[in-house]
From Swiss-Prot:
InterPro entries: Class_I_gatase-like, FGAR-AT_PurM_N-like, Herpes_virus_tegument, PurM-like_C_dom, PurM-like_C_sf, PurM-like_N_sf, Tegument_herpes_virus_N. It is found in: Virion tegument. This is Probable membrane antigen 75. GO terms for biological process: intracellular transport of virus; purine nucleotide biosynthetic process. Keywords: Virion, Virion tegument. The keyword Phosphoprotein does not apply. One of its GO terms (molecular function) is phosphoribosylformylglycinamidine synthase activity. It comes from Saimiriine herpesvirus 2 (strain 11) (SaHV-2). PANTHER family: PHOSPHORIBOSYLFORMYLGLYCINAMIDINE SYNTHASE (PTHR10099:SF1). GO terms for cellular component: host cell; viral tegument. The lineage of its organism: Viruses, Duplodnaviria, Heunggongvirae, Peploviricota, Herviviricetes.
């Protein structure tokens, strides 16, 4: 579906044929996947057409390597032998690099199926080998070209399931296994017996028919005709300044921090920020990121919020196992793709839509993204005809939406390289030289994006300048008709989607000391440095449309304008007939006046069912599989409290993690230090601390919050969207101080294209409410739902609202309860209890009740009343009331803390109805001595409020109605109900893990020993050394996210932080100017472990780079802090850490000689967890010397373990003091190392950090830069002013100055 191969009417199969090749299959042992385990359990010992014998089932990894072969009659025997040896060596190299993908198990050419006999059950499956390469295979293919492994054409992964049946093989055995093992996933059976003789596809080409633009998007986001404003502009409502670029953009000011390669970090400037939101059926992961980047070019996206709707659910909202897998695959593909761009996911939701039509693979995704840009980087040059049109990045086309398990997702490695190349190009040009970056809305074809790029003009495209894959296929056929060429180019280029970046470049030149250089040549140079292909497609012109010039066999010189060039094909967007009709009016909401017999519902069972409903239950199964704060800018992430409960109402994203004093170069806060003073300070830790408060309430940040009410929208769209706005407002209400005028609401709609008239009314309802609230409103996206007939009222119509605001403080209120005996106050917009569209109504009733309208003035009054109470410290905790009602809000506040609550229900209201009502409002924790003050103020504002109970310290939830006891339940039991969806998801969709320890997470104790008083009461002292400035080289790898957090952490303590590309080392430069080397992060490959090995292998293959690193490590005045996958693997590969045997001399690029390997975590997935760490008292590490003996926590992203190459390697390191850090239990006993997942991510070695034998070089699996400040911590067990992690960097600065 995502990779159709060929247009049937084109006579060109030979042009797409791969070189002569053969495919070899390698097998390696592995564990059962969840679907394989279910298959074995289902068919083992069970009567039916297929019965498997007990304990005879196995599964293996398959690595399928397609290798180029030669036609033997054209070569001599010696040549054939030499080439065979070369192919064998190249295959061996790539298999070594693929080791993490197969869990380091040995590969063999023989499967385990050879001794199963006549009743053998054999089923191999994987990607479709007759379509374009999967994303993982494409990344590996490009890596092979870089490494000059020329014989390797394609590398794919598959699974080989074997068993033995009780009966002889039945005819439909393959159909049975296909349904059990593949299901609705985009996988195919592979015939391993005939594969070696089968010709496979070995290129990236994909065929697509022309597809018009999204109808709903056209109707809302684009002008219906010339001279008429688009609906998105008409329905928007600005309060503050705005501009118009595709739609109305509210762009508040902020501080912009930028990275310039080879220059000290950071560069600070005045900037703007903007939030773009979109909701669409799961398709391309980065299409909206690319669109937003075109609005704010050269900027930085700093946060994403992701939500998911699923329509294939039961009436109660429960999610079948197969659909659950699709959700997790979608969330992983979407979230991890965004994470690999270097951006965390900070908020989200999951909502099953049980009353919608069930469509397989119909996961609807919402993405809101926050992006900042420097105002000076937004300047464009003038638009003129004759400018160059460029495409930057690898051409990885897809022909349509992908589906689970998303094998054809966007290659983030390629996209990162393209982004890095365009930013480097802009920096190298030093003047505005781009006139357009524009893209079309949504997941569109290349044709639509190019037309948007040059609008309102046109462009010529020279076929000879298209990506190499296309021109090579065309040139392989001697004679082609003009129509065939045009059809080929349309199907394989213009009609496909690609994540390339498009830009229009000025046709002028830049004057340099060495002469004049064209801007296009600068772009090509930037592309070469970053590993991103650059295609100069053609030039702009005044004639509307895309005009193709067939110069395939006689390429034209684009530097010379050729007015004689004739077009062989002109492409434009085909017009649409409007679907909006005056006779098509939205249906009135269907309401049934039926009363509920509340006596039928038990309080305990109802609460349990609501807490376990997927819309309400914990989403930790999704949230903990995504990076939540990997750029170091997140002051409030989803997890709250000691148990990391994902209940936060909002997220806070700081402009920078730099101390304001550093950004402003404040001489009063920064103390100058000499080499001699540094020597004294290094030995006296108390001098590392000062008295100047470094973070006042003036830190610049943004706060964002989501609002969505799909259930209520299905009852009454006009009123339901107001509830979504109310949820966004009540969520952001608990964040840092702001006023309504500062808030911008961005709205994204996903709507049935047959009901656009109803969507118009919904958008105008948004506008009316926002005007009454006096908040900014911007409509940023609209898209079609799956095709449904007009009479089908079960279409998934949704509107998601994202609230954002700039704030000057990170002080806020969270749902975590603070103190026993504090009062609980329920404040709401109305005395009317809202059941329509509630989780209760969806779960327990078969009818729809009336959805009451909202009083906007009451919402405004409640917002300001709560803000006032918070500012006076009269409210110490709070949580909005939304899905699940008051009882869910109270329970979640308990889950986020160590307290319980006692609820005393108002006497005039039905007890259970009151508990499950979803009338917008909030539950406030108020110090008991201030209760009367709070309630008086709420009454004066005309708000409805109820004093509903108190906080208790017995960890129970007790409910009383008029003094009658209704329920007392342990918080732990309620939490297990709330966690049930996540647990069920884990059990059905994850590999086998010891369930006994799976929930041993959170509640980390901390023991700072001698540092406790200092870290609790004193801030870090900021130093600078003008006489001996010290510099750190922060190494960046092509295709990997920029190490922003690491750069900022080093700059915070006084280093001159330089981002240095690996190209700097590959070109033979040295590191003599640097006292410290830092590496962090991981590869952006889909298979991150393999990508990391390839990145290190590529670097160390170069003798110049190896010698540079060796010289640096051998200098006595250097330190290294290498973190995460890339850092740890680099130090191990250079034999700096982990080498317990006599040194073997030179650094080797061969992975088999590396001293350590990285082991994936036990869940086999990326995870973001907050774990405890222990620094041994005996460690030799200089960097950690101040922290010896301490136990404290940090966030761990892409949790890993270490795999040793030699016996007793860990014991020897323990004895020689080179173990620097270990995973630890929740307790402060120094001997209680973490032995099991998740506290020990791999479940094997507990070692999390290793230093060199001289103590100067440190490899950590953790990223300490993400916890440099206490505000970056998910939870602080004790009040801290200074993070212990900051002392590492302070120690390094003082050591480097004194040395």
């Amino acid at each position: 579906m995502a990779a159709n191969r060929h247009g049937g009417h084109l006579p060109l199969p030979e042009g797409l044929a791969a070189p002569t090749h053969r495919t070899v299959i390698y097998y390696a042992k592995c564990d059962f996947s969840p679907s394989e385990e279910r298959c074995v359990n289902r068919f083992t010992g069970r009567p039916g057409p297929l019965t498997l014998m007990r304990d005879r089932s196995n599964v293996e990894h398959m690595v399928l390597i397609t290798v180029k072969t030669d036609e033997e009659d054209r070569n001599t025997a010696e040549q054939n032998q030499a080439r065979a040896r070369s192919r064998s060596q190249e295959t061996k190299k790539i298999l070594t690099l693929l080791a993490p993908q197969i869990d380091y198990n040995p590969l063999t050419l023989d499967s385990l199926d050879h001794n199963l006999g006549q009743r053998a059950v054999i089923f191999s499956y994987g990607p479709n080998l007759h379509q374009r390469l999967t994303t993982s295979a494409l990344e590996l293919q490009r890596a092979c070209k870089t490494l000059k492994l020329h014989s390797i054409l394609r590398i794919e992964s598959g699974r080989h399931f074997t068993s033995k049946a009780v009966q002889y093989v039945v005819e439909n055995e393959d159909d049975i296994l296909t349904a059990a093992l593949i299901g609705e996933n985009n996988l195919y059976q592979i015939n391993t017996e005939t594969l070696s003789a089968t010709r496979l596809v070995t290129d990236a080409l994909s065929w697509a028919e022309y597809k018009p633009l999204d109808v709903t998007c056209n109707a809302v986001m684009k002008p219906p005709r010339e001279g008429v404003q688009p609906m998105c502009l008409v329905a928007s409502s600005p309060v503050s300044d705005y501009n118009f670029n595709k739609y109305l953009m509210i762009t508040p000011s902020c501080t912009a921090i930028s990275l310039h390669m080879g220059h000290p970090y950071p560069r600070v400037s005045q900037g703007i920020f903007h939030v773009h939101s979109s909701t669409r059926t799961m398709g391309r992961q980065c299409c909206d990121y690319l669109f937003h980047s075109s609005l704010l070019p050269n900027g930085n996206t700093t946060a994403f919020a992701c939500g998911y709707y699923v329509t294939s659910t039961t009436g109660s909202g429960s999610i079948p196992t197969s659909v659950n897998e699709q959700i997790l695959h979608a969330a992983s593909a979407q979230g991890r793709s965004l994470n690999n761009l270097g951006v965390p996911v900070v908020s989200g939701f999951l909502k099953p839509l049980p009353r919608c039509s069930e469509v397989p693979n119909n996961v609807i995704t919402h993405v809101s993204q926050l992006r900042t840009a420097s105002e000076r980087d937004l300047n464009l040059c003038r638009v003129r005809a004759g400018q160059f049109v460029a495409a930057v990045g690898a051409y990885d086309p897809t022909s349509g939406p992908d589906k689970s398990p998303y094998l054809y997702r966007d290659s983030i490695d390629s996209l990162n390289r393209a982004i890095q190349a365009t930013k480097l190009f802009y920096q190298m040009c030093e003047t505005p030289c781009v006139s357009s970056y524009q893209r079309e809305f949504g997941s569109c074809s290349t044709l639509h994006h190019l037309l948007a790029l040059v609008s309102p003009k046109g462009m010529t495209v020279h076929i000879s300048r298209l990506p190499e894959e296309i021109t090579k296929a065309l040139r392989s056929v001697p004679v082609l008709e003009e129509d065939t060429v045009c059809a080929f180019v349309s199907g394989y280029f213009f009609n496909c989607f690609s994540s390339q970046l498009f830009l229009v470049i000025d046709d002028k030149v830049k004057t340099t000391p060495s002469g004049q250089i064209h801007f296009t040549d600068i772009l090509k140079k930037a592309g070469n440095l970053c590993g991103a292909p650059v295609y100069i497609l053609g030039r702009t012109c005044n004639d509307i449309g895309i005009h193709c010039v067939n110069d395939l066999y006689h390429p034209r010189d684009l530097s010379v304008l050729d007015s004689q060039a004739t077009s062989s094909m002109t492409l434009t967007v085909q017009p649409h007939a409007s679907v909006v009709s005056a006779t098509l009016q939205p249906q009135e909401p269907h309401e049934e006046d039926e009363s509920i017999d509340w006596a039928m519902f038990g309080t305990s069972s109802t609460i349990s069912n609501i807490l376990s409903h997927p819309a309400v239950a914990s989403k930790s199964n999704i949230i903990r599989r995504l990076d939540r704060c990997g750029n170091g800018l997140i002051a409030q992430q989803p997890g709250i409290g000691p148990s990391d409960a994902p209940v936060s109402d909002y997220a806070i994203i700081c402009d920078s993690s730099m101390f304001p004093a550093r950004l402003e170069n404040d001489a009063q806060s920064i103390k100058k230090i000499s080499k001699q003073e540094a020597q004294r300070a290094y030995a006296q830790i108390h001098k590392w601390f000062g008295t100047e408060k470094l973070f006042l309430n003036t830190i610049s940040a943004k706060v964002i919050a989501l609002g969505e009410q799909a259930y209520k929208l299905s009852r009454n769209p006009i009123v339901g969207v107001k509830y979504a706005i109310a949820e966004a407002i009540t969520n952001i209400m608990f964040g840092p101080d702001c006023v309504l005028e500062d808030i911008t609401l961005t709205v994204a709609a996903h709507w049935n294209k047959q009901e656009t008239a109803a969507l118009y009314r919904v958008l105008f309802a948004c506008k009316e409410m926002c005007r009454e609230l006096n908040v900014n409103l911007s409509i940023t996206d609209a898209s079609d739902s799956r095709d449904t007939p007009i009479q089908d009222t079960d279409a998934a119509n949704t509107v998601v609202v994202t609230a954002s605001a700039r704030v000057t403080s990170i002080e806020r209120i969270t749902p975590a309860l603070k103190k026993a005996e504090n009062a609980l106050v329920h404040v709401c917009l109305s005395k009317e209890l809202t059941l329509s569209g509630s989780v209760f109504e969806n779960s327990f009733t078969a009818f729809s009740s009336h959805l009451p309208d909202l009083d906007t003035s009451k919402l405004r009054d409640m917002f300001y009343a709560v803000k006032h109470l918070i500012s006076k410290n009269l409210v110490v905790a709070g949580h909005d009331i939304s899905d699940g009602g008051l009882i869910t809000t109270a329970a979640e506040m308990c889950f986020a803390s160590t307290f319980g609550v006692t609820v005393n229900l108002p006497s005039a209201l039905p007890a259970l109805m009151y508990l499950v009502s979803e009338t917008p409002g909030a539950l406030l924790e108020v110090p008991k001595e201030h209760l009367s003050t709070v309630t008086t103020l709420l009454s004066e504002r005309g708000l409805t409020w109820y004093a509903v109970g108190t906080v208790n310290n017995v960890k129970n939830l007790s409910i009383y109605d008029n003094g009658t006891h209704l329920l007392t339940e342990s918080i732990n039991i309620l939490n297990s109900k709330w966690m049930s969806y996540a647990e069920e998801s884990f059990e059905t969709c994850e590999p086998h893990i010891e369930s006994m320890y799976r929930n041993d997470y959170g509640n980390n104790a901390m023991d700072l020993k001698h540092l406790e008083d200092l870290c609790t009461h004193k801030p870090l002292q900021l130093y600078t050394c003008p006489s001996h400035p010290v510099s750190v080289a922060v190494l960046t790898f092509p295709g990997c996210p920029d190490p922003v957090a690491t750069l900022q952490a080093f700059a915070n303590v006084g280093f001159l932080s330089y981002p240095i590309s690996t190209e700097f080392l590959l070109q033979g430069n040295n590191l003599n100017a640097f006292s410290c080397l830092a590496v962090s992060g991981s590869s952006a490959f889909e298979e991150e472990g393999t990508g990391t090995r390839i990145a290190i292998y590529t670097l160390l293959q170069c003798d110049l780079a190896k010698n540079c690193l060796k010289e640096f490590f051998q200098r006595p005045d250097t330190l290294s802090l290498c973190c995460g996958e890339l850092g740890t693997q680099l130090l191990a590969a250079c034999q700096v850490v982990g080498d317990t045997h006599p040194s073997r001399g030179d650094i080797s690029s061969n992975p088999e000689s590396w001293t350590l390997e990285l082991e994936p975590n036990a869940s086999k997935h990326y995870e973001s967890l907050w774990l405890n760490f222990h620094v041994p008292q005996t460690t030799k590490s200089i960097i950690l010397q101040a922290l010896r003996g301490t136990i404290f926590q940090d966030g761990l992203w892409q949790v890993l373990g270490l795999r040793y190459k030699h016996d007793a390697q860990e014991y020897i390191m323990q004895q020689n003091g080179t173990i620097a850090m270990s995973y630890h239990s929740a307790k402060i006993n120094p001997y209680l190392y973490a032995m099991h997942y998740p506290r020990n991510p791999s479940g094997n070695s507990s070692v999390a950090g290793i230093c060199s034998k001289n103590g100067r070089h440190l490899a950590l699996l953790v990223e300490p830069a993400l916890s440099f400040h206490t505000w970056q911590w998910q939870h602080i067990p004790k009040p801290l002013v200074t993070s212990p992690w900051a002392l590492m960097y302070q120690c390094m600065f003082l050591w480097c100055v004194k040395e």
